[in-house]
Amino acid sequence: MGSTVPRSASVLLLLLLLRRAEQPCGAELTFELPDNAKQCFHEEVEQGVKFSLDYQVITGGHYDVDCYVEDPQGNTIYRETKKQYDSFTYRAEVKGVYQFCFSNEFSTFSHKTVYFDFQVGDEPPILPDMGNRVTALTQMESACVTIHEALKTVIDSQTHYRLREAQDRARAEDLNSRVSYWSVGETIALFVVSFSQVLLLKSFFTEKRPISRAVHS
């Protein structure tokens, strides 16, 4: 009976840990950004709360985009032009709706795909205060904290590799399209040159006979 309680508690804490790892605070989104277009997002943030923005261009053009962040008073607190990826962290000085925008207005024909991850607030403690704790429970909590940190690392690594895979796949598809078009063009050019050579050689071996006309007196 004595070993049943710690085992049940460990299972409960592990399930809670996994649930918290699956429900991060904030939002992440991948969206399409057409050429000559701008897309803005809004989030209300309390005063003194920290928020962070990570973004990366996955496909399109030179894989770059303009990005800026404005506070509720319209002041620009972050601005970068033609960035492939970047991170920005800020602690809100005033309460209100903060706006962050992505602009592709400098591009006339390149369609972009942009990914961003917007996080608000500090991460809450993994385990609530449990008052009096036995030694076994303290060791179990320490193990759960280690597992939680490892899960966060795994999630971040999976996101990073997923973005790299999407970007590499887009580049490979673009390269494949260019190679295909180039191959078709070379095939057509080769056919035209071959046909022209055949006509030229045929003209060399064609005997030109003078046309005689009978003159009737």
UniProtKB/Swiss-Prot annotation:
Q: Which InterPro entries match?
A: Emp24-like, GOLD_dom, GOLD_dom_sf
Record keywords: Cytoplasmic vesicle, Endoplasmic reticulum, Golgi apparatus, Membrane, Protein transport, Signal, Transmembrane, Transmembrane helix, Transport
Q: Where would you say this protein principally sits, based on its record?
A: endoplasmic reticulum
The way it spans or sits in the membrane comes to: Single-pass type I membrane protein
Subcellular location(s): the record lists: Endoplasmic reticulum-Golgi intermediate compartment membrane; Golgi apparatus, cis-Golgi network membrane; Golgi apparatus, Golgi stack membrane; Endoplasmic reticulum membrane
State the span of motif (COPI vesicle coat-binding).
204-217
> One GO term of the cellular component aspect?
COPII-coated ER to Golgi transport vesicle
Positions in the Cytoplasmic compartment: 202-217
Q: Which Pfam families match?
A: EMP24_GP25L
Q: Does the keyword Metal-binding apply?
A: no
Record keyword Cell membrane present: no
- Give the transmembrane ranges: 181-201
Point out the signal peptide segment: 1-23
Motif COPII vesicle coat-binding in this chain: 204-205
On the Lumenal side, which residues? 24-180
Instruction: Give the domain of life.
Output: Eukaryota
Look up the record and give one Gene Ontology term from the biological process aspect: Golgi organization
For this protein, the record's SUPFAM superfamilies field holds: Supernatant protein factor (SPF), C-terminal domain
Report domain GOLD positions: 38-120
UniProt record similarity statement: Belongs to the EMP24/GP25L family.
Functional description taken from the UniProt entry: Potential role in vesicular protein trafficking, mainly in the early secretory pathway. Contributes to the coupled localization of TMED2 and TMED10 in the cis-Golgi network.
Quaternary state and interactors: Monomer in endoplasmic reticulum, endoplasmic reticulum-Golgi intermediate compartment and cis-Golgi network. Interacts (via C-terminus) with COPG1; the interaction involves dimeric TMED3; however, there are conflicting reports on the interaction. Interacts with GORASP1 and GORASP2.
| Protein name as catalogued | Transmembrane emp24 domain-containing protein 3
Please name the source species. Homo sapiens
